[in-house]
């Protein structure tokens, strides 16, 4: 469950390293986001020579979540960190590589480009 002011790691090579959630998209009063949801983030740490600068605002898709998420078959999935992939306004990833595993829920939510770039889908 990601809410505004949550700090997240960035799982791609866009240049940002750490971001902070500033808004959960999908409703006027939505409080929490889960796997595969789109949020608006502010970049808190970035590499010095990247296109993404510290303080810039971007959209991101949640790919890993520390909170246990129940799947339709009754199993639960949980990761060691909260991580996002930065996307543009067309919801395509900004980076060209994705680091670490991503959840299978992204395929169900039509983020096939992120799933195809990921080294492992759990």
Swiss-Prot record:
InterPro entries: Ribosomal_uL14 (IPR000218), Ribosomal_uL14_bac-type (IPR005745), Ribosomal_uL14_CS (IPR019972), Ribosomal_uL14_sf (IPR036853). It comes from the Bacteria. CDD domains: Ribosomal_uL14. Keywords: Ribonucleoprotein, Ribosomal protein, RNA-binding, rRNA-binding. GO terms for biological process: translation. One of its GO terms (cellular component) is cytosolic large ribosomal subunit. One of its GO terms (molecular function) is large ribosomal subunit rRNA binding. Gene3D superfamilies: Ribosomal protein L14. It holds the Pfam family Ribosomal_L14. Part of the 50S ribosomal subunit. Forms a cluster with proteins L3 and L19. In the 70S ribosome, L14 and L19 interact and together make contacts with the 16S rRNA in bridges B5 and B8. Belongs to the universal ribosomal protein uL14 family. PANTHER family: 50S/60S RIBOSOMAL PROTEIN L14/L23, LARGE RIBOSOMAL SUBUNIT PROTEIN UL14M. Binds to 23S rRNA. Forms part of two intersubunit bridges in the 70S ribosome. This is Large ribosomal subunit protein uL14. It comes from Thermodesulfovibrio yellowstonii (strain ATCC 51303 / DSM 11347 / YP87).
């Amino acid at each position: 469950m990601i809410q505004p002011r949550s700090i997240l790691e960035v799982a791609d090579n866009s240049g940002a390293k750490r971001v902070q959630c500033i808004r959960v998209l999908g409703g006027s009063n939505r409080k929490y986001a889960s796997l595969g949801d789109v949020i608006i983030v502010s970049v808190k740490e970035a590499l010095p020579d990247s296109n993404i600068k510290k303080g810039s605002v971007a959209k991101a898709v949640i790919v890993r979540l520390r909170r246990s998420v129940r799947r339709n078959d009754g199993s639960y999935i949980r990761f060691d960190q909260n991580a996002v992939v930065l996307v543009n306004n067309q919801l395509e990833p900004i980076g060209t590589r994705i680091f670490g595993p991503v959840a299978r829920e992204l395929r169900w939510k039509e983020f096939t480009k992120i799933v195809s770039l990921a080294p492992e889908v759990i």
